[in-house]
């Protein structure tokens, strides 16, 4: 860019002439109140031609180009990380029996080496977008692979990944290469040329919609009452607020109400000149916090990069003017921009104004239609009813960020052989690489269909698949989300019709949450509780582990019958009644009332409690020996308590070994907690370096395979082993390359129903 900067350097007087000329061709200054507030007059909206002229008004390209550069740079960083280039071989390894969840069943991943080629094209597109090199082609090279990878896996969908695709789509049609770009160096007509106002209008409108719709979604009662992110206030980032407020008030006032007000107001604060500095401060603080609170990749930084779009478009030129003269030679141009055919210029000093052409009208139409579509999509749930579960709409484009938190207590997958009638049970998540299928009917249907294709390999013919999934959303009762009596393989599902086998969320029981919190707070530290709600006519089969020596069930509402399977005994419970449950046995809880039943399991993990007491005794004994209050010699099997490790002699007891492992773990946690900042930062850089190193090496291996053919398996194994090395990290660091993420285990056929335990 330095060549472009030097070639346009002019004297201060010449800069002033160019600026005056640009002001003349852009039209008169807006002196009315509306013009000062919004940047346009009512007359600009009085006809289609005037609106087209407004949206194609010549605008400084500087701010748009800076956003293009930052967005492209962040996508370059995103592709090896959240897009998964560094772990692509574990996700798309050829020959894996894996159930996948594309938007359309016809979408299939390419062979592994070709998937690396797809990611390479996407990476080069992001790099070209950042540099402004063959800009339009680079945008397309990034955009097409990005949406292909995005649509290939619904389990990875989220709001910010969807937003990246939208921003790349918008940039494809914009003139973001008219400033600080390689294209500008090579083409004098593009270099430092105006861009039409609609380029900024679309981007600003998109960011405004993200903030505002997210705020509207947070008007949900669960968010306003503080149930959505109840535990977030425990994070150390909220410690300053807890100097004045309790943890509960910090959660309600700061996390929930503060987040609601910020989302509703951020777009307005950024839009108006008078409030922009306040808006920039709060959204910057907000996104910096989010980058530490959540694993959301580049989202916080993309939003930070988008904030300056609301500032005056020429702000980069003003920033450059404050830099030393020598440094300015390496920075973007500060000269006034030149005219562009993409813009419509008004009358200036006796000259007639320019008539808008087809390209100008298409730009204006694109702006209006795109923003209207973005306002409509978050509320289009009545069209895509098949994707409506307890929350409405396709996940990822509704901007309902962090409004719903879920916990899964119990997941059981039952298969029945269609010919023999034999029952069996599958490990939850077998043949998948994600856990997200548990909450969405469309993915559950895809999972069941996939299992019906795979199970015949394990001598299960014409399999029927049943799911019993218990979920709590925003601290409600645990309840079934799908009907466990329905064979999902044969169940009907359509994207445009309501799914009949989705159980309704028991909203009538929401007021119970305050009472449930009271019950939790009244229990001691060793007592746990699980709250259950079930539908009439259904039953829960459960197993009480032998570790849970003191387990009881108490009815809160409705009526249930508890069957003790081994004892062949039934007992009916009514509101307020409870009974003890034997450990190591199965029981069934039938809802016999005409309305949903509510009950709770109260239990103590007696094995864990005894272990904690024994470990506390060993810790106390160790401290007594160290401070001299314990004068008697320790038995040989307890000597490792003082030495911190086993150094020969009698084999320590399992309890002592557990104590030593616990001490080592606590020491490691303390060491990491007290690590200086520069060491933490260095370790962070090493982890990122490994991600990029592995991405590069595995990509080179795959591209070599495509060009020259695959070598022997022994050579491939050596190359992959080398790619997995962490030469920059200390020995003992956990390598994700050694972690198996496929979970492609065969089903467990077991005549005895072994389920997940509460």
UniProtKB/Swiss-Prot annotation:
Example GO molecular function: vitamin binding
Its EC number(s): 4.1.1.90
Membrane topology: Multi-pass membrane protein
Cross-referenced Pfam families: HTTM, VKGC_lumenal_dom
Bias type Polar residues, positions: 735-747
Record's catalysed reaction(s): 4-carboxy-L-glutamyl-[protein] + 2,3-epoxyphylloquinone + H2O + H(+) = phylloquinol + L-glutamyl-[protein] + CO2 + O2
GO CC terms, sorted: endoplasmic reticulum membrane
InterPro entries the record matches: HTTM-like, HTTM_dom, RmlC-like_jellyroll, RmlC_Cupin_sf, VKG_COase, VKGC_lumenal_dom
Disulfide bonds, paired cysteine numbers: 99-450
Ranges annotated as spanning the membrane: 61-81, 114-134, 137-157, 293-313, 362-382
Region feature Disordered, mapped onto this chain: 1-21, 732-758
Subcellular location: Endoplasmic reticulum membrane
SMART domains (UniProt xref): HTTM
PANTHER family per the UniProt record, alphabetical: VITAMIN K-DEPENDENT GAMMA-CARBOXYLASE
Function according to Swiss-Prot or TrEMBL: Mediates the vitamin K-dependent carboxylation of glutamate residues to calcium-binding gamma-carboxyglutamate (Gla) residues with the concomitant conversion of the reduced hydroquinone form of vitamin K to vitamin K epoxide. Catalyzes gamma-carboxylation of various proteins, such as blood coagulation factors (F2, F7, F9 and F10), osteocalcin (BGLAP) or matrix Gla protein (MGP).
More about this protein: The vitamin K-dependent protein substrates of carboxylase have usually a propeptide that binds to a high-affinity site on the carboxylase. CO(2), O(2) and reduced vitamin K are cosubstrates.
Protein name per the record: Vitamin K-dependent gamma-carboxylase
The species this protein was found in: Pongo abelii (Sumatran orangutan)
Gene coding for it: GGCX
């Amino acid at each position: 860019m330095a060549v472009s900067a030097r070639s346009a350097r002019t004297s201060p007087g010449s800069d002033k002439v160019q600026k005056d000329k640009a002001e003349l061709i852009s039209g008169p200054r807006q002196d009315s109140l509306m013009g000062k507030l919004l940047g346009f007059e009512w007359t600009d909206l009085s006809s289609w031609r005037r609106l087209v002229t407004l949206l194609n008004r010549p605008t400084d390209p500087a701010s748009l180009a800076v956003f293009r550069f930052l967005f492209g740079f962040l996508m370059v960083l995103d592709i090896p990380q959240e897009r998964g280039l560094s772990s692509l071989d574990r996700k798309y390894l050829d020959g894996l029996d894996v159930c996948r969840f594309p938007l359309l069943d016809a979408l299939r991943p390419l062979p592994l080496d070709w998937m690396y080629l797809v990611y390479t094209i996407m990476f080069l597109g992001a790099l070209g977008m950042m540099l402004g090199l063959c800009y339009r082609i680079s945008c397309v090279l990034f955009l097409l692979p990005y949406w292909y990878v995005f649509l290939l896996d619904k389990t990875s969908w989220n709001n910010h990944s969807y937003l990246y695709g939208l921003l790349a789509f918008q940039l494809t049609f914009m003139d973001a290469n008219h400033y600080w770009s390689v294209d500008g160096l090579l083409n004098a007509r593009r270099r430092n040329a105006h861009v039409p106002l609609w380029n900024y209008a679309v981007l600003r409108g998109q960011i405004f919609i993200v903030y505002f719709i997210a705020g509207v979604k947070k008007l949900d009662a669960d968010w306003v009452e503080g149930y959505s992110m109840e535990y977030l206030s425990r994070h150390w980032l909220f410690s300053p607020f807890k100097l004045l407020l309790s943890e509960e008030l910090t959660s309600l006032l700061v996390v929930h109400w503060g987040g609601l007000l910020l989302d509703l107001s951020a777009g307005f604060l950024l839009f108006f000149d008078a409030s922009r500095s306040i808006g920039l401060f709060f959204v910057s603080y907000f996104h910096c916090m989010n980058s530490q609170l959540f694993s959301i990749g580049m989202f916080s930084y993309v939003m930070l990069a988008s904030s300056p779009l609301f500032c005056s478009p020429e702000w980069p030129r003003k920033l450059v003017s404050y830099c030393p003269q020598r440094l300015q030679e390496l920075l973007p141009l500060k000269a006034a921009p030149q005219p562009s055919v993409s813009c419509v210029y008004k009358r200036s000093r006796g000259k007639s104004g320019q008539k808008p052409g087809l390209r100008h009208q298409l730009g204006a139409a694109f702006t209006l239609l795109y923003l209207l579509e973005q306002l409509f999509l978050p509320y289009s749930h009545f069209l895509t009813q098949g994707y409506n579960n307890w929350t409405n709409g396709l996940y990822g484009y509704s901007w309902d960020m962090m409004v719903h938190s879920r916990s899964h207590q119990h997941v059981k997958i039952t298969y029945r052989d269609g010919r023999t009638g034999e029952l069996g049970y599958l490990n939850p998540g077998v043949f998948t690489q994600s856990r997200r299928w548990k909450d969405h009917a469309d993915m559950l249907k895809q999972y069941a269909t996939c299992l019906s294709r795979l199970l015949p390999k394990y001598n299960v013919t014409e399999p029927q698949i049943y799911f019993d999934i218990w979920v709590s959303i925003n601290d409600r009762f645990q309840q079934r989300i799908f009907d466990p009596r329905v064979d999902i393989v044969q169940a009907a599902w359509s994207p445009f019709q309501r799914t009949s086998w989705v159980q309704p969320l028991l909203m009538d029981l929401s007021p119970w949450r305050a009472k449930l919190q009271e019950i939790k707070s009244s229990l001691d530290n060793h007592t746990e509780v699980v709250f259950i709600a079930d539908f009439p006519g259904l039953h829960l089969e459960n197993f009480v582990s032998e570790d849970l020596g003191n387990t009881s069930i108490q009815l809160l509402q409705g009526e249930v019958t508890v069957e003790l399977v081994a004892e062949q005994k039934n007992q009916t419970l009514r509101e307020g009644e409870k009974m003890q449950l034997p450990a190591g046995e199965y029981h069934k809880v039938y809802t016999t009332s005409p309305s949903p039943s509510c009950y709770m399991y109260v239990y103590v993990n007696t094995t864990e409690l005894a272990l904690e007491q024994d470990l506390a005794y060993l810790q106390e004994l160790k401290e007594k020996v160290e401070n001299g209050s314990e004068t008697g010699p320790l038995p040989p099997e307890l000597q490792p308590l003082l030495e911190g490790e086993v150094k020969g002699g009698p084999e320590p007891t399992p309890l002592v070994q557990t104590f030593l492992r616990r001490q080592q773990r606590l020491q490691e946690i303390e060491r990491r907690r007290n690590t200086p900042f520069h060491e933490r930062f260095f370790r962070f850089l090493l982890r990122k370096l490994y991600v990029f190193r592995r991405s590069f090496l595995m990509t080179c291996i795959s591209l070599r395979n495509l060009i020259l053919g695959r070598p022997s398996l022994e050579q491939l194994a050596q190359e992959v082993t080398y790619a997995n090395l962490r030469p920059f990290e200390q020995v003992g660091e956990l390598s994700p390359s050694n972690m198996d993420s496929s979970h492609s285990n065969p089903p467990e056929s077991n005549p005895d129903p072994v389920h997940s335990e509460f």
